[in-house]
A protein has these predicted regions:
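Active-site cofactor/cluster-binding pocket
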Residues: 20-25, 31-116, 120, 127-156
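Long, charged alpha-helical interface segments
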Residues: 152-182
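Short, extreme N-terminal leader segments that mark the start of a protein/domain
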Residues: 1-34
Length: 182
């Protein structure tokens, strides 16, 4: 690893999915993150990956993450709205959404934004410049290489941006802008 200091990674685990398929639990078993079942025991500073946030993650967020933690919400996509609502009321973490990426996991392969917890955490680390740690986070998964292959050009582009605005514009160079944004 060439990263100077490993980023502290946590997942708020709401126990809503099949534990055998849970990527956060697998990462915890490998010692790569800590799962928290109580929101009150999660990190108090840092970034919460929130798929409903309006603020994009950018390389500028590295300081927030280094000074605190990178925290993912590990829950069912079917219950995402209620899960985010509960978490957002009880944490002071800064919410960030990832720019558009494609899932590489077998359940949601190729779908925009429908990433597993491991994919979302890895993408976040990659975007903020912690590429070695990002890649190592995916090594326990057969789909890890597929995720990186699908998104390498996007991840490189996003990680080269200097602001959230640049990240937002960059995603529209790769994907069609929703008609409501035009």
């Amino acid at each position: 690893m060439t990263d100077i200091k490993k980023i502290r990674i946590e997942a708020i685990h709401l126990d809503q999915d099949d534990p055998k398929k849970c990527t956060a639990k697998k990462l915890e078993r490998r010692g790569l993150l800590r799962c928290k079942t109580r929101i009150s025991s999660a990190a108090k500073r840092g970034i919460l990956l929130d798929p409903l946030s309006e603020t994009l993650l950018s390389p500028n967020d590295l300081n927030l993450i280094e000074d605190g933690s990178l925290v993912a919400l590990d829950c069912s996509w079917k219950r995402i709205n209620e899960s985010v609502r509960i978490i957002s009321k009880t944490t002071r973490l800064e919410s960030r959404i990832l720019p558009i990426l494609l899932a590489g996991n077998p359940v949601s392969w190729g779908k925009r934004g429908r990433m597993s917890t491991a994919e979302a955490l890895s993408a976040s680390l990659y975007i903020v410049g912690r590429k070695d740690q990002a890649i190592s986070l995916l090594t326990p998964f057969k789909f890890g290489d597929a995720f990186l292959d699908l998104n390498r050009q996007l991840l490189e582009a996003y990680s080269s941006c200097n602001s959230q605005t640049e990240v937002e514009e960059m995603q529209w160079e790769f994907f069609d802008r929703p008609s409501s944004d035009i």
